[in-house]
Amino acid sequence: MISGLKGTLKKLEVGYAHIETGGITYEVTISFKTYLELKSLPSHNEVQFQIFHAMNERGQKLFGFLTEQDKEFFKVIKGLQGIGELTALKILSFFSAEELYRIAQSGEAKELEKIPKVKGKTSEKIFFEVKQNLKKLELFLSGTSKEPSISLSSFSETPEEAALSRKREIAILGLVQLGFEEKTASKEVDKILKSSSPTDPGEIIREILKSL
């Protein structure tokens, strides 16, 4: 079992990274959050992943995280009934453990629909499972450090700027998952943000799709 991986970042795409170590290149599945954190690094930079090594009858897959806390959060979510590894990774891309706990307590299941391709019954299913397992989230939160995890933008941004940045990132990911190239998605999102003040990522995406 592989539990950690340190090596040279050879390739980075939305959803995965290639890490070369010891003459072998590994493909590591990553969240959009991790992708954004790695994107600012110089090419061929050395990175270190905390790895969740998944093995089943279909094969093996490495899921990579930049902090042990993110890895443990992923394990908590994927352990819920009916929530697989890829869905857990999507949740991790958009919500922290604190945010997910707040959503479950407040009853705002619709907030989960910020995740691309998570609508209706799917968001309700995720909400139900999280709600039924609040104790697991409480235990996770009580055992984690209060120090912030790696964030390349949070140190210099105001709360308003951070909210806008997060809205932008979510909209770009949504467009990428709809088939847009990342560069095109970024350009279209920035165009909408300059010309109007959309309230959420879904509104940004709808405006872009309407203009096509």
Swiss-Prot record:
Q: Which GO CC annotations does the UniProt entry carry?
A: cytoplasm; Holliday junction helicase complex; Holliday junction resolvase complex
What stretch or stretches form a coiled coil here?
A: none
Instruction: Tell me the CDD domains matching this sequence.
Output: UBA_RuvA_C (cd14332)
What are the protein's UniProt keywords? Cytoplasm, DNA damage, DNA recombination, DNA repair, DNA-binding
Chain residue ranges for the region called Domain III = 163-212
Q: Where in the cell is it found?
A: Cytoplasm
Task: Report residue spans for region: Flexible linker.
Answer: 146-162
Record region (Domain I): 1-66
Establish whether keyword Hydrolase is in the entry. no
The record's annotation in InterPro entries points to: DNA_helicase_Holl-junc_RuvA_I, NA-bd_OB-fold, RuvA, RuvA_2-like, RuvA_C, RuvA_C_sf
State the residue spans of region: Domain II.
67-145
A single Gene Ontology biological process assigned to it is: DNA recombination
Q: Is GTP-binding given among the entry's keywords?
A: no
Q: Show the Pfam families listed in the entry.
A: RuvA_N
GO molecular function terms listed in the Swiss-Prot or TrEMBL record: ATP binding; four-way junction DNA binding; four-way junction helicase activity
| Broad class of where this protein is predominantly found | cytoplasm
Q: Which family does it belong to?
A: Belongs to the RuvA family.
Q: What is known of its domains?
A: Has three domains with a flexible linker between the domains II and III and assumes an 'L' shape. Domain III is highly mobile and contacts RuvB.
The annotated subunit structure for this chain is: Homotetramer. Forms an RuvA(8)-RuvB(12)-Holliday junction (HJ) complex. HJ DNA is sandwiched between 2 RuvA tetramers; dsDNA enters through RuvA and exits via RuvB. An RuvB hexamer assembles on each DNA strand where it exits the tetramer. Each RuvB hexamer is contacted by two RuvA subunits (via domain III) on 2 adjacent RuvB subunits; this complex drives branch migration. In the full resolvosome a probable DNA-RuvA(4)-RuvB(12)-RuvC(2) complex forms which resolves the HJ.
Stated role: The RuvA-RuvB-RuvC complex processes Holliday junction (HJ) DNA during genetic recombination and DNA repair, while the RuvA-RuvB complex plays an important role in the rescue of blocked DNA replication forks via replication fork reversal (RFR). RuvA specifically binds to HJ cruciform DNA, conferring on it an open structure. The RuvB hexamer acts as an ATP-dependent pump, pulling dsDNA into and through the RuvAB complex. HJ branch migration allows RuvC to scan DNA until it finds its consensus sequence, where it cleaves and resolves the cruciform DNA.
The name this protein carries in UniProt is Holliday junction branch migration complex subunit RuvA
